[in-house]
């Protein structure tokens, strides 16, 4: 496993250690997915370490809250750079480097279906990701590579919790009929399914793993 990370070296190294403790091999590669040279270097490192790439999961993302206002253009640009430009770069390298049986998985969001105020830049970026997934699945026709997206609802991660009050978090947790936030393991299980043999006939789809949130 090649673990790409933006800046949290300690967390990346801990993830690598956990993978190795479980009996597999792993490396960590620091990369900004908005930078073409970083994405190329990340794939090069994976190929150098393991000889091939079978599954690519693009989960890099930012989620700043900003209304649709001219004064928030910098926030919009930054969100698009990481979430959409980054997805374009990662998916393009995956398309050129994976062989038959490969799996490409991108992360979207179920917030697209709810259109909450303040989520404009984030929703715009993730709607673009879903478009890329469907187009790439068709561009890879005949190569036996699937391209799908997972669209979680609210997940109890640092990205989601940052900047929200306890009352806001509780309110969001009550939105799904299951009345809780998802855990990272909930979403990882869906990604694992798409990466595995049982999902060989699932292609160009967006799986909305959200507990009924949307």
Task: Describe the role of every protein-language-model region.
Residues 96-97, 138-142, 200:
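Alpha-helical segment proximal to the catalytic Tyr-Lys
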Residues 9-10, 30-42, 73, 185-186:
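The beta1-alpha1 cofactor-binding region of Rossmann-like NAD(H)/NADP(H)-dependent oxidoreductases
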Residues 67-68, 72-80, 160, 172:
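Substrate-binding pocket helix/loop in short-chain dehydrogenase/reductase
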Residues 1-13:
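Conserved glycine-rich Rossmann-like NAD(P)H-binding loop of the short-chain dehydrogenase/reductase
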Residues 114, 174, 192, 203-214:
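Short C-terminal tail/terminal secondary-structure segment
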Residues 91, 125, 133:
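Active-site helix of classical SDR
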Residues 71, 111, 115-123, 135:
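Active-site loop-to-helix junction immediately N-terminal to the catalytic Tyr of the SDR YXXXK motif
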């Amino acid at each position: 496993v090649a673990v790409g990370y933006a800046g949290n070296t300690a967390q990346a190294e801990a993830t690598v250690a956990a993978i190795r403790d479980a009996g597999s091999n792993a490396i960590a590669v620091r990369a900004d997915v908005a930078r073409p040279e970083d994405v190329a270097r990340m794939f090069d490192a994976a190929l150098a370490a393991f000889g091939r790439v079978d599954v690519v999961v693009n989960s890099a993302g930012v989620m700043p809250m900003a209304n649709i206002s001219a004064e928030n253009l910098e926030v919009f640009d930054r969100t698009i750079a990481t979430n959409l430009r980054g997805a374009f770069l990662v998916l393009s390298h995956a398309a050129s480097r994976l062989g038959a049986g490969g799996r490409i998985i991108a992360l979207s969001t179920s917030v697209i279906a709810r259109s909450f105020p303040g989520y404009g830049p984030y929703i715009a970026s993730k709607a673009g990701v879903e478009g890329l997934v469907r187009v790439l699945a068709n561009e890879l026709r005949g190569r036996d590579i699937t391209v799908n997206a997972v669209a979680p609802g609210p997940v109890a991660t640092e990205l989601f919790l940052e900047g929200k009050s306890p009352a806001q978090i509780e309110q969001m947790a009550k939105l799904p009929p299951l009345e809780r936030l998802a855990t990272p393991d909930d979403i990882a299980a869906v990604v694992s399914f798409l990466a595995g043999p049982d999902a060989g006939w699932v292609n160009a789809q967006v799986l909305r793993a959200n507990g009924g949130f949307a």
